[in-house]
């Protein structure tokens, strides 16, 4: 019998501290950095973001999202036989955030590892879990995107510090005899490393080089809109579908302009696009599962619908997954 994988539960978590654009602008003003709600909304569509407390790590946020996904799936931690965490802000250099989260969750013993593909991380992680389930290597996987990007922001750079927030999203992906994930498409091009990066590295116990996020916004936008369309069309072709078949586009929640461009290229109304970036900003690898969970819990996205998930991030990395919920 051919094996497939299906999402059976979703979950998400945002830390309690919420900063509106006006809140953030007031804090930045004390450091001599000027911005405003109008400036941020016009360029990004972001109205608020959440920042984790200093003692809270990616594994803590991921743990809460994982628990909610397990509850939604009617599963227990002990049922999980694979944990993949997508993060660019790990708790430690090593061991992996997945191992740390595994112990907190009480799912010890199964394979657990991190995937680092920045904002494409959840797409990469979901695709890996799907492949492992299809080969019989796992039956019930926990796939998590978790980030504390507030730790790596340069709050003197108004072009980047207003964009990002902290959060986590998770799904339970289970073996099924009916297709859930229909196709995936993953890519990377390392020649674009410099347009979105944190160039510091650990050596001899010290962080060497610049430890904070750097981004060439116009270059990222130009590249993103092209590669996202390529990935979207690739998964549709692999699954024998067309853009007209899509019920919902759930893109990486980076910038409303990129999402509008993606929808326009696919000839989709924005009414078919799940948008949550206004509420939590760019949460990197957490953004797609956050948006998916919000849409499922609100009743907007329903079982049986065709979803196109797409992400793009530093590396440069990008990809898409087409699935029936």
Swiss-Prot record:
Q: Which is one Pfam family of this protein?
A: ACP_syn_III_C
Active site, renumbered = 119, 252, 282
UniProt keywords, alphabetically: Acyltransferase, Cytoplasm, Fatty acid biosynthesis, Fatty acid metabolism, Lipid biosynthesis, Lipid metabolism, Multifunctional enzyme, Transferase
Give the reactions, separated by semicolons, that this protein catalyses.
Answer: malonyl-[ACP] + acetyl-CoA + H(+) = 3-oxobutanoyl-[ACP] + CO2 + CoA
Entry-linked InterPro entries: ACP_syn_III_C (IPR013747), ACP_syn_III_N (IPR013751), FabH (IPR004655), Thiolase-like (IPR016039)
Keyword match Cytoplasm: yes
Tell me where it resides.
Answer: Cytoplasm
State the source organism's domain of life.
Bacteria
Q: Where is this region: ACP-binding?
A: 253-257
Quaternary structure annotation from Swiss-Prot or TrEMBL: Homodimer.
Question: Which purpose does this protein serve, as stated in its record?
Answer: Catalyzes the condensation reaction of fatty acid synthesis by the addition to an acyl acceptor of two carbons from malonyl-ACP. Catalyzes the first condensation reaction which initiates fatty acid synthesis and may therefore play a role in governing the total rate of fatty acid production. Possesses both acetoacetyl-ACP synthase and acetyl transacylase activities. Its substrate specificity determines the biosynthesis of branched-chain and/or straight-chain of fatty acids.
Cite the domain annotation text.
The last Arg residue of the ACP-binding site is essential for the weak association between ACP/AcpP and FabH.
Q: Which family does it belong to?
A: Belongs to the thiolase-like superfamily. FabH family.
Kindly provide the name given to this protein in its UniProt entry.
Beta-ketoacyl-[acyl-carrier-protein] synthase III
């Amino acid at each position: 019998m051919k094996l497939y994988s299906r999402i059976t539960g979703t979950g998400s978590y945002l830390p309690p501290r919420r900063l509106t654009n006006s809140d953030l602008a007031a804090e930045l003003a004390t450091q001599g950095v000027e911005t405003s709600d109008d400036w941020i909304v016009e360029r990004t569509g972001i109205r608020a973001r959440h920042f984790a407390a200093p003692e809270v790590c990616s594994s803590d946020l991921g743990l809460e999202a994982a628990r909610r996904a397990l509850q939604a799936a009617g599963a227990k931690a002990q049922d999980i036989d694979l944990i993949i965490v997508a993060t660019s802000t790990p708790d430690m250099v090593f061991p992996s955030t997945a191992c740390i989260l595994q112990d907190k969750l009480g799912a010890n013993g199964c394979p657990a590892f991190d995937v680092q593909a920045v904002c494409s991380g959840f797409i990469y992680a979901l695709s890996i879990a799907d492949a492992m389930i299809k080969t019989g290597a796992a039956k019930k996987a926990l796939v998590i995107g978790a980030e504390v990007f507030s730790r790596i922001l340069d709050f003197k750079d108004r072009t980047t510090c207003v964009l990002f927030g902290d959060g986590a999203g998770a799904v339970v992906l289970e073996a099924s005899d009916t297709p859930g994930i229909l196709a995936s498409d993953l890519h990377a091009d390392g020649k674009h490393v410099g347009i979105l990066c944190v160039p510091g590295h650990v050596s001899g116990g010290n962080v060497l080089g610049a430890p904070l996020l750097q981004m060439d916004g116009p270059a990222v936008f130009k590249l993103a809109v092209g590669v996202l369309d390529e990935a979207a069309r690739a998964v549709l072709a692999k699954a024998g579908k067309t853009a007209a078949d899509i019920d919902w586009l759930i893109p990486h929640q980076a910038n409303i302009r990129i999402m509008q461009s993606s929808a326009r290229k696919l000839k989709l109304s924005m009414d078919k696009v799940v948008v949550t970036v206004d509420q939590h900003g760019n949460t990197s690898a957490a953004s797609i599962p956050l948006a998916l969970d919000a849409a499922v819990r609100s009743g907007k996205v329903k079982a049986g619908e065709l979803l196109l998930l797409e992400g793009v991030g530093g590396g440069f990395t990008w990809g898409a997954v087409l699935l029936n919920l």
